[in-house]
A protein has these predicted regions:
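Surface-exposed, glycine-biased beta-strand/turn segments
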Residues: 18-93, 99-104, 118-128, 133-134, ...
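C-terminal beta-strand-rich structural cap/linker in extracellular carbohydrate-active enzymes
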Residues: 412, 634-653
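Long, low-complexity serine/threonine/glycine- and acidic-rich segments characteristic of extracellular
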Residues: 133, 174, 189-192, 200-344, ...
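A short beta-turn/strand-edge loop motif at beta-sheet boundaries
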Residues: 220-222, 238-244, 366-373, 410, ...
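Contiguous beta-strand segments within globular domains
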Residues: 206-250, 354-362, 451-461, 589-597, ...
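Proteolytic processing hotspots in large secreted/extracellular or virion-associated proteins
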Residues: 529-538, 565-616
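Proteolytic-maturation and junctional protease-sensitive modules
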Residues: 471-476, 550, 587-643, 689-693, ...
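Short, compositionally biased P/S/T/A/G/V-rich stretches that sit at domain boundaries
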Residues: 164-221, 338-360, 434-453, 648-668
Length: 748
């Protein structure tokens, strides 16, 4: 029976493979793919391939196999003009961002637009109503919808309507290049975790030994639970384009701990992108790192295979780590390295002697019997900025110490930061040694407080510009009183030990104390809210005018969240701030579902022409769909990430310009086939194509509005008769500013 089953499975697999290989390419162009399956996009995975059309529209798109047209859809956003084809093998194929369809389908669209009095069309067909043979022309490539340039977006979906990877389902590319590795991140997954002497996530470069093999830069010293995340790309022979990898597997001591395969997924799990590609590292501009672990089954995407979770809680000692990263053509790259599991260690350093151009420093183990065999040293200036890595002129062992000779030109008037490495591979916490450097005055230097929210813990930071030799500690006043000694992890930067988010419950404030010959106390107002389990919660700004509301669905796990006032916000080119700017925190926390921010207006103030905006690094101040409650004068908006927000007044109407036809112009009937122009709003923006109206002699036109190019386009159905015409364009931005342009023209 087993043999029969194996033979049958082999036959079916071969049959599916041969069937898949029989598909044809959807464009009559060379195979150039600019973006592949599961590439990270804002809060979603890329569901298919972006196929290059050489920067032009109008290339013929053909059916990859026989079947029927299941659906056509037309809109001004998203995928624009889309055709869904049901193949005879049961799969669905999507051709998107099209410029147009067949003549028959274009006629059906025009009929539906007139019938529904809307540009938007969503038309379904019965099975076999619109038959299509392999290679049949089905439309033209374009840049419709939210496309950033001409290309064909191409998807394949299985019988459950799940996107599947075209590269592994009949559209593989000739590829002899192995995936390229970049960096490895080690993520703390418990409040007790320490990584190379540090409690925050650590990112390590990977050393290339060959095209097929990369290595850790050194043994990584870990204490307690961690997860690994990988920054890697794939390259395809003949193209200088970075692609998403097809999969990766993590092994510890030759046992598989985690497997990731970008084969298929459900649209309902798109939000898990931010738990699959590390959201914190991405928001901190470190790039895209594929997590090789899951926090819980709730955060497990369809790409995670098997029952292993990848959270590494390893026994003390050395553990070999191996990663196998592969592409769709089964080109494989390996990464290998070692994790050393042991409690964190400390060192101390002292200057033994000086010469004309060098100083001699001894680095001792502090509280450990294991000798120091190596070290890393960085020089910081008196303001606490790192300037240079200091390499030794010489080094030698002396009992358990390491004695090193360092150049004076790199160390004089600087703070030296030492991390010792002992004979077992343990990496110490940082130790600071000033060498003829100015020490900051702890009584007058201003300090700032910030908080980092990790996966399972919270780290409080107090920082200033300078180096301090005094001891420092925090007192947290909340549901319980906590006294926390601080460590100076860099000159002028003090960190608490990691706390559980629950330790911040009912927090009223934080007192920072620096103890020297004189004692200085600073009080910081800090009032986070705690989201736990099935409860909704709300955090308020210190001034009480901004509130951040969460539901039981907002977070994946217990989270402390709070609001900070922004002292020096990014300025406005147009418009006026009508509130303070508030930073919602933790800004790098992945959200499962939406939260709601509300900002209170003055009682005497109208909300006309106002809205809540957030700051986007690429787009600048960006409008959020806002609603006013007249009862409490709160302007509110939903959001899916924590941003800097403010109420902004925008009184500038949209601009309507560069229109064809021109004012008082005359055209021949056969040359007049399209009406086009620009409609643009600099601040609040145009929300939807329905916020623009266009009439020709009083009759509504059902036009396309391209949200990226800010372009209106209407294709005439036939030719205009001779005579004079009036075109009227009206545009309203998202806070109600309106513009109207009237164009009179004639046709011969």
């Amino acid at each position: 029976v087993k043999l029969y089953t194996l033979i049958l499975a082999t036959i079916l697999s071969l049959s599916n493979f041969l069937s898949a290989q029989d598909y044809i390419w959807p464009l009559k162009l060379g195979r150039v793919v600019s973006s592949n399956f599961a590439n990270p996009r804002p809060r979603r995975f890329h569901a298919g391939l972006d196929i290059s059309t050489e920067g032009k529209t109008g290339h013929e798109v053909v059916a990859i196999d026989s079947g029927y047209v299941e659906r056509i859809r037309v809109s001004s956003d998203g995928y624009g003009r889309i055709l869904y084809q049901k193949l005879n093998d049961g799969k669905t194929v999507v051709y998107a961002h099209l410029d147009g369809f067949t003549d028959l389908l274009n006629e059906i669209i025009r009929f539906e637009q007139k019938r529904n009095r809307s540009y938007d069309v969503d038309k379904y067909f019965r099975p076999n109503e619109m038959l299509v043979n392999k290679g049949d022309f089905i439309g033209y490539s374009g840049d419709s919808g939210g496309a950033f340039g001409p290309h064909l977006h191409f998807e394949m979906r299985d019988t459950l309507n799940r996107p599947i990877n075209p590269f592994t389902n009949g559209f593989g590319m000739d590829d002899r290049h192995r995936p390229k590795m970049d960096r490895l991140a080690v993520i703390p997954l418990s409040p007790e975790t320490v990584i190379n002497g540090v409690t925050l996530p650590q990112v390590f470069p990977l050393h290339r030994k060959s095209a097929a093999l990369y290595e850790f830069p050194d043994t990584i010293h870990v204490f307690n639970t961690v997860g690994l995340a990988l920054s890697a790309v794939d390259e395809i022979t003949g193209f200088a384009i970075k692609y998403n990898i097809t999969g990766a597997a993590l092994f510890v001591d030759d046992a598989e701990q985690f497997r990731l395969e970008f084969d298929h997924y459900s649209f309902t799990n798109n939000h898990l992108l931010e738990m699959s590609v590390d959201n914190s590292l991405r928001r901190l501009n470190d790039g895209n790192f594929h997590r090789l672990f899951v926090i819980s089954n709730e955060t497990k995407s369809d790409f995670v295979k098997g029952s292993s979770h990848g959270r590494l809680s390893l026994s003390p000692g050395y553990h070999s780590v191996s990663l196998r990263v592969f592409d769709h053509a089964q080109n494989v790259t390996r990464i290998q390295g070692t994790l050393y599991i042991a409690p964190p260690t400390r060192v101390r350093a002292e200057i033994l002697s000086e010469k004309a151009s060098t100083i001699t420093v001894a680095v001792y183990p502090d509280g450990s019997p294991f000798p120091i065999t190596d070290f890393v040293c960085y020089a910081f200036n008196a303001k606490g900025y790192p300037e240079v890595k200091v390499d030794p002129i010489s080094k030698e062992k002396s009992d358990r110490a390491l004695v090193v000779e360092l150049p004076k030109k790199l160390t004089r008037n600087r703070i030296l930061q030492f991390m010792g490495i002992n004979s077992l591979g343990g990496v110490s916490e940082a130790y600071h040694l000033p060498y003829k450097a100015e020490v900051a005055d702890h009584m007058t230097t201003p300090f700032q407080l910030s908080v980092s929210h990790l996966e399972k813990s919270v780290v409080i930071e107090v920082a200033a510009r300078g180096y301090f030799q005094q001891a420092a500690n925090l007192t947290l006043k909340g549901s319980k009183l906590l006294n926390l000694p601080l460590k100076q992890v860099r000159p002028g930067v003090f960190h608490s030990a990691p706390l559980k988010p629950q330790d911040l419950a009912e927090m009223e404030g934080i007192t920072f104390t620096v103890s020297g010959a004189a004692v200085r106390e600073m009080r910081f107002r800090f009032n986070p809210e705690l989201s736990v389990g099935a409860e909704s919660a709300a955090a308020f700004s210190i001034d009480g005018k901004c509130v951040l509301q969460t539901t039981k669905q907002t977070f994946y796990d217990t989270t402390a969240f709070w609001i900070e006032a922004v002292e020096n916000p990014v300025s406005l080119e147009t418009g006026r701030f009508k509130s303070k700017v508030y930073q919602l925190q933790p800004f790098d926390r992945a959200l499962k579902d939406s939260a709601r921010v509300s900002i209170q207006l003055k009682k005497s103030e109208s909300a006309e022409k106002m809205g809540i905006f957030y700051y986007d690094q690429k787009e600048g101040w960006t409008y959020l769909p806002s609603k006013l409650s007249n009862v409490d004068r709160l302007l509110s908006a939903p959001l899916y990430s924590f941003e800097a927000v403010a109420v902004i007044e925008d009184t500038v109407p949209p601009r309507i310009y560069d229109f064809f036809p021109g004012q008082n112009a005359s055209y021949s009937s056969t040359d007049f086939t399209t009406i086009s122009g620009k409609v643009e709003d600099d601040l609040a923006g145009i929300g939807k194509d329905k916020d623009i109206q266009m009439t020709l002699d009083g009759e509504s036109l059902y036009f396309e509005y391209h949200p990226i190019k800010k372009e209106v386009r209407y294709r005439l159905d036939g030719f205009l008769g001779a005579g004079q015409y009036q075109l009227v364009i009206t545009a309203t931005d998202q806070v109600g500013n309106r513009s109207t342009k009237e164009i009179t023209f004639s046709v011969n």
